[in-house]
């Protein structure tokens, strides 16, 4: 008969040591993990939906202000105004600015944007600004998340149903569930044969629609920029690509992608003379709008209702959102010069101007009324948006709420 195995004192000590090592290792992993640094405080109750303003206000006054250096324009989704500053993204009451929910990861934010019903915070890790977390804006509860290879700095934009994130060497387009639709540019390792593993070109400007992406690239040993049109394909890292030469448009020029529709892209080029060209999906220029002079370094674009508006630094060009057909230009008049792109309020185009807002017929561009508002001087574009009946302005790193 085999004698039962006896555990010695040494065995017990060894087993205890293993348990301690495993526990310490787990504790160290947790201590250095994003989970330990994440602080999520959902809303006490679901946030009610906003109701659109039905009339244009006759007066405006400041309601509240908040730091929001990580948004590039007012972010409104799920009944809240979303701000991002430092390491924290907040969902705020549009009327009062009070915090309804908060989310932070213990690291400086790369940027904040919105998509569908989510507020999206992007944080850095060892692979760049590619840690994205979606928060249901109406509840403050966590939704989808993703981790991606990215540049150390990225620019974020949204069309409402997708997000574009791009830096100097790489871009990605994400669906509302943060699943990647398109990736393009630098890879840190060869994943598939035929997919480049090194940066080919520097990405200088990009914009997207749910159906396509347009990006300008400065490529090695090339004096001119090129425009690249991307469409999602079966493999996200092998999109359909159409490259368009931009002769005479230097790699250090201020050329930029203004907006993208399903099959067209609006781009600004400075040569042979300043103009906005509309490029179709085959790469052909199908329309051009000449500008009286080049835009300033301070430009901005908004997509509101069925129009796209582009602020050039002293005027606002308005295009049809679907086909990017040029409609009209809002220029300085009566001592009032535009200081940012437009938004839409109660069916009227609302343009921030020197001492307030001017309203215009959205279809014809005919001037209507002026709403007085005193602002401190700003050296950036003033970018407006609506949150119900509250008018928001992104003024550099500050978000300002206005009402009657």
What spans do the regions from the language model cover?
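Acidic, serine/threonine- and glycine-rich low-complexity intrinsically disordered segments
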Residues: 185-321
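Repeated scaffold domains used in trafficking and secretory/extracellular systems
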Residues: 65-76, 104-118, 147-161, 190-206, ...
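Intrinsically disordered, low-complexity segments enriched in Gly and acidic/Ser/Thr residues
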Residues: 282, 290-294, 303-372
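Long, acidic/polar, low-complexity amphipathic helices and coiled-coil-like
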Residues: 91, 95-225
């Amino acid at each position: 008969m085999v004698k039962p195995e006896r555990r010695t004192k040494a065995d017990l000590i060894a087993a205890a040591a293993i348990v301690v090592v495993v526990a310490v290792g787990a504790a160290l992993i947790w201590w250095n993990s994003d989970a330990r640094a994440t602080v999520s405080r959902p809303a006490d109750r679901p946030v009610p939906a906003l109701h659109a303003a039905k009339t244009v206000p006759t007066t405006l006054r400041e309601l509240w202000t908040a730091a929001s250096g990580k948004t590039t324009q007012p972010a409104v989704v799920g009944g809240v105004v979303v701000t991002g500053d430092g390491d924290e993204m907040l969902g705020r009451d549009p009327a009062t600015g009070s915090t309804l929910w908060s989310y932070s990861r213990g690291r400086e934010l790369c940027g904040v944007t919105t998509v569908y019903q989510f507020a999206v915070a992007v944080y850095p890790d060892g692979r760049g600004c590619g840690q994205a977390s979606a928060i249901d804006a109406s509840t403050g509860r966590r939704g989808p998340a993703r981790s991606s290879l990215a540049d150390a700095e990225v620019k974020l934009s949204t069309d409402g149903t997708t997000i574009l994130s791009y830096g100097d060497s790489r871009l990605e387009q994400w669906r509302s569930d943060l699943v990647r639709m398109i990736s393009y540019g630098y890879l840190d390792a060869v994943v598939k044969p035929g997919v480049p593993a090194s940066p080919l070109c520097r990405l200088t400007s990009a914009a997207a629609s749910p159906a396509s992406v347009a990006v300008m690239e400065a490529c090695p040993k090339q004096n001119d920029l090129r425009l690249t049109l991307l469409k999602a394909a079966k493999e996200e890292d092998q999109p359909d690509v159409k490259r368009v030469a931009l002769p005479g448009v230097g790699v250090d020029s201020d050329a930029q992608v203004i907006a993208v529709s399903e099959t067209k892209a609006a781009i600004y080029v400075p040569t042979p003379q300043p103009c906005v060209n509309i490029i179709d999906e085959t790469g052909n220029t199908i329309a051009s709008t000449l500008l009286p002079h080049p835009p300033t370094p301070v430009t901005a674009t908004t997509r509101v209702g069925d129009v796209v508006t582009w602020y050039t630094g002293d005027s606002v060009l308005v295009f049809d959102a679907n086909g990017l057909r040029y409609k009209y230009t809002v220029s300085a008049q009566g001592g009032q010069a535009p200081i940012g792109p437009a938004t839409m309020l109660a069916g009227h185009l609302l343009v921030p101007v020197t001492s307030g807002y001017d309203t215009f017929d959205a279809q014809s561009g005919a001037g209507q009324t002026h709403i007085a508002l005193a602002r401190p001087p700003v050296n950036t574009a003033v970018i407006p948006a609506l949150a119900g009946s509250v008018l928001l302005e992104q003024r550099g790193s500050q978000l300002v709420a206005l009402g009657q």
